[in-house]
Amino acid sequence: MTDETNLSGFGSKAVHSGTNHIGDAVNTPIFQSSTYKLTDERYAGWAAGAQHTLLYARLSSVNSDAVAAKLCAMEGGEDAETFSSGMGAISTTLVSLLSNGDHIVASTDVYGGTYGLMTEELPRFGISTTMADMRDPASYEAAIQENTKILYIET
């Protein structure tokens, strides 16, 4: 890995952080592995709750870990998750934050997949959504209920 303590500029962080110099490659090579050897060390890390243990590519990979490290360096974050699609990111975030009985206020012009998630899928789990006009803050305020957990706006 690059010594990220010496990277000060945004561009330098974008290029150099999260880089895994395997085989003297300047940038992290693209790995097409879907599974990784389950060593005792990796298993122990996974069992202890390590978030970025290399076990299976859908959970973590050398490449997704490199992207996450770059995002953290550029944004000053502690950790990051990467997803293969926007809907993967949206649905994972909403499902992890909401429970049966919770409510969302969302903008009327969300992406069609988001609309379907909020109006067809989440109600099956007892999560309701009220649509509001994002151009009118008063409509958001009027839609807030006692059980509202998320105000959702897409741009």
Segments from the language model and where they lie:
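N-terminal "arm"/small-domain region of PLP-dependent enzymes with the aminotransferase-like
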Residues: 2-61, 69
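Buried hydrophobic positions in well-ordered alpha/beta secondary-structure cores of metabolic enzymes
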Residues: 24, 71, 89, 104, ...
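Conserved N-terminal alpha-helix of the aminotransferase class I/II PLP-enzyme fold
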Residues: 40-88, 113-121
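Glycine- and other small-residue-rich loops at beta-strand/loop junctions that grip anionic moieties
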Residues: 56, 82, 107-108, 129-132, ...
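Short helix-loop-beta connector
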Residues: 74-78, 98-101, 146-147
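Well-ordered alpha/beta subsegment
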Residues: 76-77, 103, 137, 141
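Conserved PLP-anchoring active-site segment centered on the Schiff-base-forming lysine
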Residues: 96-114, 132-133
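PLP-dependent aminotransferase-class I/II
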Residues: 116-155
